[in-house]
Amino acid sequence: MKASLLNKLDNLSDRFEELTALLGDAEVISKQTQFRAYSKEYAEIEPVIATFRELRKVQSDLEGAQALLKESDPDLREMAEEEVAQAKEALTTLEDKLQRMLLPKDPNDGRNVYLEVRAGTGGDEAAIFSGDLFRMYSRYAEKQGWRVEVLSANEGEHGGFKEVIARVEGDNVYAKLKFESGAHRVQRVPETESQGRIHTSACTVAVLPEPDEQAAIEINPADLRVDTYRSSGAGGQHVNTTDSAIRITHIPTGTVVECQEERSQHKNRAKAMAWLAAKLQDQQEAAAHKEISETRKLLVGSGDRSERIRTYNFPQGRVTDHRINLTLYSLSEVMAGGVEAVIEPLLAEYQADQLAALGD
């Protein structure tokens, strides 16, 4: 293991001892905010320290076994050789585990997200596929125990959505969905196609982390134009006699958000403002992320909304993620909500990319 990583682990060990003492201090215990902060830090460090201590023990066992290799007794040497081999194998496993534990954490991983699915090229078929994609993510969310709340939906003339925006709430939503942003292409025979020809259509997906309330971007009310209109689509039959739907335009950036799913204009406005904050924060972070990507070209996670990331080929039952050259012939399972078959390899590849950067 690199000296810099060992030094970092030694520093973490010192901090862990310090936190242990602080959490037993009566004065700290009486200050709930401080106590919670220390407890959270302790919980994050504790698994790393436990693994580091295990590594130190294995290193000690290895040194002891290597010393026995010098013994004249052949049976003792044979036993020592086995112990050395086992210790070296355990050491490699623990070093790899520790390196992964020390990878930089994405501060947004634990956040809820705003999921945007929009029809691109392909007309009615693109809208229908947008509906299929949104259904895929909704079923995946259900399997994860997440909650999906539609904020705005513009339905297609023949089904699906021209655009659908939803808030997805649960544990580690952004961590799982953050690499879904980009252009998704579908190849299939549309229901409206009489001659059986395969058409190619596209949709774009954007996944934006919901900002922390305390760290949320400041928005000047003078920079906003707020329009109200009568709601349509889901729930519209209940509220279409009043202007309950809200459209907010952030004038400096031209960013527009709207929410029409609640019967209350006040609730729609609150949800639209939260979504606007997420979009503005995403725009700010995109510039910084672009610099990182250009410095060291990331295999996944470029975040480019226009980048074609995946193809769904229905005649072949194939789904291909172009970023990691992953091809699966289980399209029906993926579309039924089993998208983890694509997400998990993406996350593994990203982690490998981080490990490579750690070694540079």
From Swiss-Prot:
Subcellular location: Cytoplasm
Keywords associated with the record: Cytoplasm, Methylation, Protein biosynthesis
InterPro entries assigned: PCRF (IPR005139), Pep_chain_release_fac_I (IPR000352), Pep_chain_release_fac_I_sf (IPR045853), Prokaryotic/Mito_RF (IPR050057), RF-1 (IPR004373)
Pfam family, any one: PCRF
Predominant subcellular localization, coarse grouping: cytoplasm
Family: Belongs to the prokaryotic/mitochondrial release factor family.
NCBIfam families in the record: prfA, PRK00591.1
Listed name of the protein: Peptide chain release factor 1
Lineage: Bacteria, Pseudomonadati, Pseudomonadota, Gammaproteobacteria, Pseudomonadales
Name of the gene this protein is made from: prfA
